Amino acid sequence: MFGPVSVEMIIERVDEVRGKVKAPPSKSYTHRAYFLSLLADSPSKVMNPLISEDTIASLDAISKFGAQVNGNKIIPPQELTPGKIDARESGTTARISLAVASLARGTSVITGKGRLVERPFKPLVDALRSLKVKISGEKLPIAVEGGNPVGEYVKVDCSLSSQFGTAMLILASKIGLTVEMLNPVSRPYIEVTLKVMESFGIEFERNGFKVKVHPGIRGSKFHVPGDYSSASFFLAAGALYGKVKVSNLVKDDPQADARIIDILEEFGADVKVGRKYVVVERNEMKPINVDCSNFPDLFPILAVLASYAEGKSVITGRQLRLKESDRVKAVAVNLRKAGIKVKELPNGLEIVGGKPRGFTVESFNDHRIVMAMAILGLGAEGKTIIKDPHVVSKSYPSFFLDLRRVLNEG
């Protein structure tokens, strides 16, 4: 069990976890639906959006660009207004805003804080400059002189982030553009973008990751599905400690982190997938080798699973060091503190499973590190202390409340 949610969280070992939880709304879908609502030709309703620090940053951004927001209803402006967009620590907000700012006549400045000011933007800046957009800077803050992107075709290097491709696809939906995405990582996120575009009536033809987008965005009543990334922590708890059912998960959703289902089976867990739920039950854990390049947000919780699997697991990914933290380093530091044998690789970790002990979590101000280590702590000998549990608000504000609820059911 654990102490109260406040400045500090204390998690203690539990004998078993048995319960159910409803997956929160998807962060990825919420971001995309907000920005397409901003650019649509008529009002939209975004139903069941995620309310978190990152999605609030996107909601504030579309308001700055001129959208009227009234509850779930979003009324697009007749003309976008330029301004200062504070993306806070949301990479998706910053990158889509940068592309949208190219449509707003006048100067917009995209800012942020924390690790976001260190994260890459140059490939997106280069793509926009190829459309004759005047941009100052290649890291935040970035100034954009918007109003009239010119061109019919653009290449964007997506080897560092699929968000560059998403940003250009959303821009293309307004002006009509063929977008060729080169070497995309996290490819399922592109599929999510295209799925949301379809819901807003956007027509396109694609050949792999070359997409010809026709201009025209219709207002939509968009229902945000559940988030596999947030659900992954509870699914992992079921695999490690008992049995957990997570509802509000759509079967065959293109979300990158839906891969958690297959990976849990590889680890040895018993998994049952229903039309709108997933049940995971404990079994003997086996080590695995997995490349997280297409689903980097699963890396922390997969490392936790590997910590309990007898033998050596290898978990890698192309851009793990470029997230909210250097996740390779962040996970390695915490697992070593828990007494787990870890070898740091250039793009991932070798982890030898063992018996974790309680420790004080170093969050690196990364929501997914905190949530993953909370799950680790449920099976560790002794107390696991989280000094800044509030960082989960970036993506899953109710995480600890949901965790408490699941533990109380068992």
UniProtKB/Swiss-Prot annotation:
Catalytic site residues?
A: D297
Keyword Amino-acid biosynthesis recorded: yes
Please provide the record's keywords in A-Z order: Amino-acid biosynthesis, Aromatic amino acid biosynthesis, Cytoplasm, Transferase
What is this enzyme's class at the first EC digit?
A: transferase
What's the catalysed reaction? 3-phosphoshikimate + phosphoenolpyruvate = 5-O-(1-carboxyvinyl)-3-phosphoshikimate + phosphate
Enzyme Commission no: 2.5.1.19
Tell me the SUPFAM superfamilies matching this sequence: EPT/RTPC-like
Q: In which pathway does it act?
A: Metabolic intermediate biosynthesis; chorismate biosynthesis
Task: Quote the record's binding site residues for 3-phosphoshikimate.
Answer: K27, S28, R32, S161, S162, Q163, D297, Q319, K323
- Family, per entry: Belongs to the EPSP synthase family.
What NCBIfam families does the record point to? aroA (TIGR01356)
Q: How does it assemble?
A: Monomer.
Identify this protein by name.
3-phosphoshikimate 1-carboxyvinyltransferase
Protein source organism: Pyrococcus abyssi (strain GE5 / Orsay)
Organism classification: Archaea, Methanobacteriati, Methanobacteriota, Thermococci, Thermococcales
**Gene (UniProt):** aroA
